[in-house]
């Protein structure tokens, strides 16, 4: 035995997910699989699912932040579809992005046309009735 050859080679490094490498919570591997299976293109590059997962994570965080604020404004600790609806419809950009989306159990934004409101009568100013 000359001491050459395999001598307990290096242990394989612990597997690290693509999500953790990119610093994301959303699953990059699952997004990659869905892009491949969805027949969106013949081939899918390595960076595409990372970018897609990052965009989805950002949009989700943005909506949840606004919905959490809406829940807090209504003195609630749980986000319900109504809070999601209020969050999306009160934000100009999200409303444009999700304009054609119906949120189940979301309700509508409170809105009363100005024409339907009672007219204000001019109050008499004191001191000018002489």
UniProtKB/Swiss-Prot annotation:
Post-translational note: Deiminated on Arg-4 in granulocytes upon calcium entry. Monoubiquitination of Lys-120 (H2AK119Ub) by RING1, TRIM37 and RNF2/RING2 complex gives a specific tag for epigenetic transcriptional repression and participates in X chromosome inactivation of female mammals. It is involved in the initiation of both imprinted and random X inactivation. Ubiquitinated H2A is enriched in inactive X chromosome chromatin. Ubiquitination of H2A functions downstream of methylation of 'Lys-27' of histone H3 (H3K27me). H2AK119Ub by RNF2/RING2 can also be induced by ultraviolet and may be involved in DNA repair.
Residue positions where Symmetric dimethylarginine is found in the record: 4
Organism field: Mus musculus (Mouse)
MF annotations from Gene Ontology: DNA binding; protein heterodimerization activity; structural constituent of chromatin
Stated name of the protein: Histone H2A type 2-B
Keywords, alphabetical: Acetylation, Chromosome, Citrullination, DNA-binding, Hydroxylation, Isopeptide bond, Methylation, Nucleosome core, Nucleus, Phosphoprotein, Ubl conjugation
Modified residues (N6-glutaryllysine): 96, 119-120
Modified residues (Citrulline): 4
Pfam families tied to this protein: Histone, Histone_H2A_C
Crosslink (Glycyl lysine isopeptide (Lys-Gly) (interchain with G-Cter in ubiquitin)) position: 14, 16, 120
Modified residues (N6-(2-hydroxyisobutyryl)lysine): 6, 10, 37, 75-76, 96, 119
Post-translational modification Phosphoserine, affected residues: 2
Protein family (similarity comment): Belongs to the histone H2A family.
Main location: nucleus
Subunit structure: The nucleosome is a histone octamer containing two molecules each of H2A, H2B, H3 and H4 assembled in one H3-H4 heterotetramer and two H2A-H2B heterodimers. The octamer wraps approximately 147 bp of DNA.
Single GO cellular component term: nucleus
Residue(s) carrying N6-succinyllysine: 10, 96
């Amino acid at each position: 035995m000359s001491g050459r050859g395999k001598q307990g080679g290096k242990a394989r490094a612990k597997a690290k997910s693509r999500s953790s490498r990119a610093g994301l919570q959303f699953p990059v591997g699952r997004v990659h699989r869905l892009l491949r299976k969805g027949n969106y293109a013949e081939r899918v590059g390595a960076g595409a699912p990372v970018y897609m997962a990052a965009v989805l994570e950002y949009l989700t965080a943005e909506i949840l932040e606004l919905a959490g604020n809406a829940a807090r404004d209504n003195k609630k600790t749980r986000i319900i579809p109504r809070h999601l609806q209020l969050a999306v419809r009160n934000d100009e950009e999200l409303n444009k992005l999700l304009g054609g989306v119906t949120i189940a159990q979301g309700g509508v934004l409170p809105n009363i046309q100005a024409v339907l409101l009672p007219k204000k009568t001019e109050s008499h100013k004191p001191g000018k009735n002489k």
